[in-house]
Regions:
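A short, structured surface patch at a secondary-structure boundary
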Residues: 158-220, 264-268
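C-terminal terminal-structure detector
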Residues: 212-269
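Residue-level signature of the cytosolic catalytic core of signaling kinases
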Residues: 5, 68, 80, 84, ...
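N-terminal hydrophobic signal-anchor/signal peptide
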Residues: 1-102
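A hydrophobic, helix-centered structural microdomain
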Residues: 84-149, 184, 258-268
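Short, glycine-rich, amphipathic interfacial segments at transmembrane boundaries or analogous
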Residues: 55-56, 61-64, 125-166, 224-247
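Alpha-helical membrane-protein architecture signal
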Residues: 80, 84, 88, 92, ...
């Protein structure tokens, strides 16, 4: 438990980095503290829970649940917060990624890999650290679509990026470059459907610039997602575009069903 004034909350949390859940029992008269603590949690990948007597201090819709005999308030309803839903989604991911990796991917790898090696010096696969579930970094796989360069981990690819190879441009436009991420799915680092993972430098930047950006990391990143089928994909020239992507990702978190995943997959690959 945290013992002290609300003013010292952020300092306390910066020292005690192992905490994941914050329970707030401030009165409604202290609403400004509720809002401050709530925003801190949203932007630092922490679960916020409010004890019922503070419900009037929240400026937004809230959800209630029970921890033992104690009712608590949550900032959103998350279907994947339930163990049975996470198990269902994981079984779905293993089944589809396993079938794809055994039946289709070997032929894709042979053909695409041969063309990559023939047209551009360097490895077939591009490996990059991305931000995943709960803010944990992981190695994300892609077919290499660019010339080997020193800006891969810092500079976002653009439509007319001179680093792209001719074949790489086709890979990116067709999304074939993303297919090795089914390896990440099978390993449990990603899901077939979820928020797209971003490079570490972009996570650091957007976490400061976009409110609630880190919320999207409460679930596994995906090969495709709700944001992508609604036009939020590829290069983000303006901050508002990334803001729209984050809103779409959070909507997906709050409305997940296995049927929604099936719909997103059908739209993405047809």
């Amino acid at each position: 438990p945290y013992l002290g004034s609300p003013d010292g909350f952020s300092d306390f949390m910066s020292v005690h980095t192992g905490i994941k859940h914050v329970f707030c029992s401030l009165s409604m008269e202290e609403g400004r503290y509720n809002f401050s603590i709530m925003n801190y949690c949203e932007n630092h990948l922490l679960y916020f829970h409010g004890v019922p007597n503070v419900c009037k201090g929240f400026p937004r819709r809230i959800w209630h649940s029970m921890v033992g005999n104690m009712p608590i308030l949550n900032l959103r309803y998350e279907p994947l917060g339930k163990m049975e839903n996470r198990i269902l989604k994981r079984i779905f991911d293993i089944a589809l990624s396993g079938i794809f990796l055994v039946t289709v991917f070997p032929f894709v790898y042979l053909i695409v890999g041969s063309i990559i090696k023939f047209t551009s010096p360097g490895p077939i696969l591009f490996k990059q650290m991305r931000t995943g579930l709960n803010g944990v970094d992981f190695v994300c796989y892609k077919f290499r679509s660019m010339k080997v360069n020193d800006e891969a981990d810092s500079k976002q690819a653009t439509a007319d990026d001179p680093r792209k190879t001719r074949f790489g441009d086709f890979l990116r436009r067709s999304n074939i470059d993303e297919l090795p991420q089914f390896i990440n799915v099978f390993k449990g680092e990603m899901s077939i459907v979820g928020p797209r993972p971003h490079m570490l430098s972009h996570t650091e930047i957007y976490a400061r610039l976009i409110d609630k950006y880190m919320v999207r990391h409460f679930i596994k990143p995906g090969v495709t997602g709700w944001a992508q089928i609604h036009g939020f994909r590829g290069e983000t020239k303006e901050l508002s575009q990334m803001g729209g992507r984050v809103k779409a990702d959070i909507w997906y978190m709050e409305h997940w069903t296995i049927f929604l995943d099936l719909y997103i997959i059908s739209v993405s690959y047809t």
